[in-house]
Amino acid sequence: MCGPTATTVANAGTGGETIKGLPPGLKKPPWLRQRAPSGERFDYLSESLTGLKLNTVCEEAMCPNVGECWNGDTGTATVMLLGDTCTRGCRFCAVNTSQTPPPPDENEPENTAHAIAEWGVGYIVLTSVDRDDIPDGGSEHFARTVRTLKTIKSSVLVEALTPDFQGDMNAVAHLARSGLDVFAHNVETVERLQKRVRDPRANYEQSLAVLRHAKASKEGLVTKTSIMLGLGEEDEEIKQCMRACKEAGVDIFTLGQYLQPTPQHLPVKEFVTPEKFDFWKAYGEEVIGFRYVASGPLVRSSYKAGEFFIESMLRKDALDRGET
């Protein structure tokens, strides 16, 4: 079990070898250190987003990969819809919270779509805060953004990283059928740790139901989910979570290291090694059968490293269906 002392976990790739997880309370291990974000492309995206009054999860959630993602040849960002204030208070998340956030910007879907079209990216991730104060949880706002973007630039591939819409399956289906290419919703952690990690209004079975219903709502839709490691989960619990997600029809599974954003958030129980993340990638693809697993200390559910593979996968699927 991962905990406040050094933990030894079996390396499934070789007989008898082990991988040691680092105990918490130490300096951040070298594989988690990133340079401060800067650069011409970074500045361009930052100014573009600010000028259009768009929010990104890259900034709001203090993502460690923002410098890398924003400084690529084309640069990519995960745009956060429906404002920057969430109606829930998960204990791992740095996004602002309030039970009465400001109303959504009605111009946001069009502004977002036009901005993305101008960036010239081939793959974009749209996400949002939870908006339990809106009857449909923001599903139509999300869907309108997707529809507008596809109208302006049909070639762009769109991933939507969604809330659970309070279990409203009509809202799930509405977004799933909006024209997006990947429907992502995160279970966040293993089943045992759900109540400790997530807001009480979220739960494991509801998240699995959302993923299952999205998959059933549109033929050919790719589904995706993610969990954080380093919160005290056990290996067998991770395997069980993978199996449950696969049974719910999930195609893509990602795993990354939990990092405590502020002292008020949950502490890190363990820094999981890169070698262990490599094991989970192999296990997920070769044993569980996911089409793709992104697994690494700095991998996040919307991290660009996986997008190159996913983009190729989606375009191949389209060719197989006879689409252009």
From Swiss-Prot:
Domain Radical SAM core intervals: 72-291
Record-linked CDD domains: Radical_SAM (cd01335)
Enzyme class: transferase
Ranges of Low complexity composition bias in the record: 1-12, 20-29
Presence of the UniProt keyword S-adenosyl-L-methionine in the record: yes
Binding site for [4Fe-4S] cluster 1: C58, C63, C69, S302
Name of this chain's protein: Lipoyl synthase, chloroplastic
Species per Swiss-Prot/TrEMBL record: Ostreococcus lucimarinus (strain CCE9901)
